Each structure stands twice: as C-alpha cells, then as structure tokens.
C-alpha cells in the first residue's frame, strides 16, 4: 500500500460520501418508503462503475492511484449497500413486503442495468 494510494482512497471516499449525503438531504424525504437519494446514489454508482471499469481497462497505463481514487474511494463512498439493506429491513419489519421487494428490485436490477450501460458507453465512445 503506497502513501499516494492511501490518500487517493481517502479523498475519493470523502467526495463520494459527501455526494451520497447531498442526495439523501435532497431526495430521501420525498418518499421515505423508498428513499430516492439512496436509490440515486446506488444507480449512479452502478453506471459509473461500468464507465470506470471500461475506462481503466482501456487506459492501463494510468497510475493505479487514479483507479483507487475513482473506484475504491469515490464509488465506495457513494454507493450505500448498508443503508440500502437497513431501508429494506425497515420496510419488511413494518410489514411492507411489496415495497421492500420493490426496493430490492429497483436497486439491484437498476444498478446491474446501469453498470452494463456504463460499460457499453465506454466501448461505444471509446
């Protein structure tokens, strides 16, 4: 682990977490049963991980710290699997099973689709 890698992950994580927090502040109260801020963070993260994987695969000469900054740091700070899990459990514990499953489908299906779209974007434009 290099010192620059450590800094890259930390800076990226802070930026990603701040963006996730901003999404939550702006959109979670709109629909507490399916918080849109968490969904937006996970869907954007799904798309951007596809873009990042495609980009870094085609730009292997870039220093590894750039990938650490973008993928491990920023996208790790942005995406919110633990928050997503607690929100789904809140639906289930409240007896809102259909909303809980909608929540799961929206996050997982949407993120997988957008990851594929991100890869496609880089390959098409690349």
Curated annotation (Swiss-Prot):
The topology of this chain with respect to the membrane is: Multi-pass membrane protein
One of the record's GO molecular function terms: metal ion binding
Q: Which UniProt keywords apply?
A: Cell inner membrane, Cell membrane, Ion channel, Ion transport, Membrane, Metal-binding, Sodium, Transmembrane, Transmembrane helix, Transport
- InterPro entries recorded for this chain? FluC
The record lists Na(+) as bound by 76, 79
Please give the biological process terms from Gene Ontology that the record holds: cellular detoxification of fluoride
A GO cellular component annotated for this chain's UniProt record is: plasma membrane
Keyword Transmembrane in the entry? The reply is: yes
- Any signal peptide, and if so, which residues? none
**Catalysed reaction equations from the record:** fluoride(in) = fluoride(out)
**Record field: transmembrane:** 6-26, 36-56, 68-88, 99-119
Function in brief? Fluoride-specific ion channel. Important for reducing fluoride concentration in the cell, thus reducing its toxicity.
The name this protein goes by in its record: Fluoride-specific ion channel FluC
State the organism named in the record.
Ralstonia nicotianae (strain ATCC BAA-1114 / GMI1000) (Ralstonia solanacearum)
Taxonomic lineage is: Bacteria, Pseudomonadati, Pseudomonadota, Betaproteobacteria, Burkholderiales
> Which gene produces this protein?
fluC
